[in-house]
Amino acid sequence: MLAEECELNPFLEHKGIEVVESDLGERILQLMHLKPSHIVLPAIHVKREQVGELFEKELGTEKGNSDPTYLTHAARKNLREKFLHAEAAMTGANFAVASTGEIVVCTNEGNADMGVSQPKLQIAAFGMEKIVPDRESLAVFTRLLARSATGQPVTTYTSHFRKPREGGEFHIIIVDNGRSKILADRKHIKTLNCIRCGACMNTCPVYRRSGGYSYTYFIPGPIGINLGMLKAPLHYYDNVSACSLCYSCSDVCPVKVDLAEQIYLWRQDLDKLGKADAMKKIMSGGMEFAMNRPWAFNTAMDLAPVGGEVLRMMGVTWGKGRDLPNFAKENFNEMWKKGKVK
């Protein structure tokens, strides 16, 4: 996802360099000219029939054949030719070990190993938050990543690189791009603990129903909301509303990033940013007025059934796709006074 963050592929292509994604999901999206919708399973939203049609057009596969095994073999054959003729290989890093200077790449397809096996030039780029102190720490994180991302004890391939192949070059790029500023932000520093496992997306009720493309930041879900706000709050402020504050993301996070709490803090900052929703501010002000004055609250409860009928007659947007619920004939206060509630 670092390439997406830095918009690396368009830059290289503009320089006349052919870029080929080697992860199968990323390759599918590259051929479709689409962005990833999940940080672990980038093409999870694409149906196999769509992949079949795409490969028929781009790779010359059989017409109408959408068998996953057949399509996988076709992609492997095509990518193998790319691997054999590549002049450079660029990988990210799931982790980097400070004590040994090695980088660690976790995959289930072996594409990282294939990619670096032929070219003499290998480049590894990763964010500074990926650095762990030693191999003992690495062992903990590799298990956390696999189990939280896909439920595996460990990924199929866990590859370590720390020096160039014989006669080759190995360049390591450690990216800041605003991360050092996050380190100085005491309220949101924990965001850098994220290991990009995607567990928060898998459990988020908003993401599961709306998908990755409903967010404006390139990383969707709860972690993407926070990262987007840290990157450019005036541009990505609309994402903070895509959260039910159910706290499920905070509960499942393997590294205990308090995602929901941070989203809640971002919502509190919207007014300072000048991006608070005007209607919500009016409604919140009205609720504050009513809650502090029992007579106003009781009057509102008495008038609520009338308001509901008016809204139903007006055919408001909420009622176009669902039935508007009816208000109870008696509110709680009335039932309490009549002794109906004990």
What are these regions (language model features)?
Residues 1-187:
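The feature marks the mature, well-folded catalytic cores of soluble enzymes
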Residues 130, 192-196:
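Short, contiguous, pocket-lining structural segments
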Residues 304-342:
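Short linear elements at protein peripheries
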Residues 9, 136-139, 143, 198, ...:
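Predominant activation on well-ordered alpha-helical scaffold segments within soluble catalytic domains
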Residues 157, 165-191, 206-313:
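Ferredoxin-type iron-sulfur electron-transfer modules in oxidoreductases and energy-metabolism complexes
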Residues 197-201, 246:
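Extended amphipathic alpha-helical segments enriched in small hydrophobics
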Residues 4-7, 203, 252:
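Phosphate- and divalent-cation-binding pockets in alpha/beta enzyme and binding domains
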